[in-house]
């Protein structure tokens, strides 16, 4: 089987994780205590959920996941929440003191004490798999744990499971909304290792998702659980083809094959359609063509950047629900004729499509409407560079004065690491510029790293 292990790191990773596992359970008819009611199993394919859940002798389903945080409060919510019986207590790992928004604490001092325990738990999960396909890593790069411990774990996973693919779902700092002063430092230091140690990284940012909730779901003041439920739909759509059957199934390794033209250029935009409230859905018939074109709307992107400022290199459309290949081909043909959606000249085809017959599931009482069909788009666009240049310029403003640097050095980092990471990101910006440039002839940049 093609199992995936999910690793949720830090507050953002864990809270997105909660939303995801809640949704997976609903999709597979698994109750919060891990049992599947008897009558369900007859119709279900037994192996459908084994990519994400392992089964115990007693018929209980346990997520192949691990939750790590350096301080206990967020994980304690899982330990006492609705799904407390779903997870094995050993899968919930928490430390005593947090990383205090400091990459160096997460990566060197405090993270170092907990990382071996985490890897040990991951090893147990991996031994339980017959054909481990890869890891899904959830974290945010603005804080201390998600950035510091997140990159430490990724580095160690690369060493121990070198060939397995690693997909990152990474929350990046928003342009306007900031949760900490040192976000730019943490993000730059963390992206430095994301560049090396993830195969595909899907960028998210809270502000973009707030705007989607406000605009499309009419939520005046969205909170994190609104955001996370939207993100969980995207992640569920991506992994649906691992868990259900469909006309065109896409597995994790296919993402990187189809989306990553050069190893470093692996930061993706994501969007999801239709995002629509129950009040409106009743009155709208959303055709495949409509949801496809709304997935390409700049306003649908889950990270603040404008795809019209860049060019698409590749794009992956994952449909689910009542969709047939004929409609998909027609919708894609329409997209190709649009002038606003530009592809680089060296990648003329550029579309990877997946279809899954399982209709989207919604969490009862949540804001999203139940719809017949939905699409999730993951695209590799050169406009992602906006996200990095924004963070880089904020980093430069602070680093020019060496503001706050002593907190990092005091935790055993060297100042050289700052400039090294910053140079790496400058090189990344340059890479994106070159890829976007006309005439795709490169001077031997093509050695693959795999």
Swiss-Prot record:
GTP binds at residues 11, 71, 144-145, 179, 206, 228. Mg(2+) binds at residue 71. It is found in: Cytoplasm, Cytoskeleton. Its EC number is 3.6.5.-. Keywords: Acetylation, Cytoplasm, Cytoskeleton, GTP-binding, Hydrolase, Magnesium, Metal-binding, Microtubule, Nucleotide-binding. Its main location: cytoplasm. GO terms for molecular function: GTP binding; hydrolase activity; metal ion binding; structural constituent of cytoskeleton. The modification N6-acetyllysine is found at residue 40. Pfam families: Tubulin, Tubulin_C. Its cofactor is Mg(2+). Undergoes a tyrosination/detyrosination cycle, the cyclic removal and re-addition of a C-terminal tyrosine residue by the enzymes tubulin tyrosine carboxypeptidase (TTCP) and tubulin tyrosine ligase (TTL), respectively. Acetylation of alpha chains at Lys-40 stabilizes microtubules and affects affinity and processivity of microtubule motors. This modification has a role in multiple cellular functions, ranging from cell motility, cell cycle progression or cell differentiation to intracellular trafficking and signaling. The keyword tRNA processing does not apply. GO terms for biological process: microtubule cytoskeleton organization; mitotic cell cycle. Gene3D superfamilies: Helix hairpin bin, Tubulin/FtsZ, C-terminal domain, Tubulin/FtsZ, GTPase domain. GO terms for cellular component: cytoplasm; microtubule. The record marks 450 as: Involved in polymerization. It catalyses: GTP + H2O = GDP + phosphate + H(+). It is an enzyme of class 3 (hydrolase). Belongs to the tubulin family. Dimer of alpha and beta chains. A typical microtubule is a hollow water-filled tube with an outer diameter of 25 nm and an inner diameter of 15 nM. Alpha-beta heterodimers associate head-to-tail to form protofilaments running lengthwise along the microtubule wall with the beta-tubulin subunit facing the microtubule plus end conferring a structural polarity. Microtubules usually have 13 protofilaments but different protofilament numbers can be found in some organisms and specialized cells. Tubulin is the major constituent of microtubules, a cylinder consisting of laterally associated linear protofilaments composed of alpha- and beta-tubulin heterodimers. Microtubules grow by the addition of GTP-tubulin dimers to the microtubule end, where a stabilizing cap forms. Below the cap, tubulin dimers are in GDP-bound state, owing to GTPase activity of alpha-tubulin. This is Tubulin alpha-3 chain. It comes from Zea mays (Maize). The gene is TUBA3.
């Amino acid at each position: 089987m093609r199992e995936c292990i999910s690793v949720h790191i830090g507050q953002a990773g864990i809270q997105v994780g909660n939303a995801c596992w809640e949704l997976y359970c609903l999709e597979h008819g698994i109750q919060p205590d891990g049992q599947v009611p008897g009558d369900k199993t007859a119709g279900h394919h037994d192996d459908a959920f084994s990519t994400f859940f392992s089964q115990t002798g007693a018929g209980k389903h346990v997520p192949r996941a691990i939750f790590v945080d350096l301080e206990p409060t967020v994980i304690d919510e899982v330990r006492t929440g609705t799904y407390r019986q779903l997870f094995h207590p050993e899968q919930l790992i928490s430390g005593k003191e947090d990383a205090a928004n400091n990459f160096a604490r997460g990566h060197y001092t405090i993270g170092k004490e907990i990382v071996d325990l985490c890897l040990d738990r991951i090893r147990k999960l991996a031994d339980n798999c017959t054909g481990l396909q890869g890891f899904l890593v959830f974290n945010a790069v603005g804080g201390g744990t998600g950035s510091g411990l997140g990159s430490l774990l990724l580095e160690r996973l690369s060493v121990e499971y070198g060939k397995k693919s690693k997909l990152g779902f990474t929350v990046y700092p928003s342009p306007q909304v900031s949760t900490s002063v040192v976000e730019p430092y943490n993000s730059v230091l963390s992206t430095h290792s994301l560049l090396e140690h993830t195969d595909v990284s899907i960028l998210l940012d809270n502000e973009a998702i707030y705007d989607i909730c406000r605009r499309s779901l009419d939520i005046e003041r969205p909170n994190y659980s609104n955001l996370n439920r939207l993100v969980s739909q995207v992640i569920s759509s991506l992994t649906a083809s691992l868990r259900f059957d469909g006309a065109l199934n896409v597995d994790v390794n296919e993402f990187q094959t189809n989306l990553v033209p050069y190893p470093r250029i692996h930061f993706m935009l994501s969007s999801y359609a239709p995002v629509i409230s129950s009040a409106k859905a009743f009155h709208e018939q959303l055709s495949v063509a409509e949801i496809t074109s709304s997935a390409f709307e700049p306003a649908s992107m889950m990270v603040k950047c404008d795809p019209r400022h860049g060019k698409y290199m590749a794009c992956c459309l994952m449909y689910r629900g009542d969709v047939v290949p004929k409609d998909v081909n027609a919708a894609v043909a329409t997209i190709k004729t649009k002038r606003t959606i530009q592809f680089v000249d060296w990648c003329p085809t550029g579309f990877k499509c997946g279809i899954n017959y399982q209709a989207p599931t919604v969490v009862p009482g949540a804001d999203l409407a139940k719809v017949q069909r939905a699409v999730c788009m993951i695209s590799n666009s050169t406009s992602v560079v906006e996200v990095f240049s924004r963070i880089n310029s904020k980093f430069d403003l602070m680093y020019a004065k060496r503001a706050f640097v002593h907190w990092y050095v005091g935790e055993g980092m060297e100042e050289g690491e700052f400039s090294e990471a910053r140079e790496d990101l400058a090189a990344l910006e340059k890479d994106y510029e070159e890829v976007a440039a006309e005439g795709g002839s490169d001077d031997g940049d093509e050695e693959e790293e795999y």
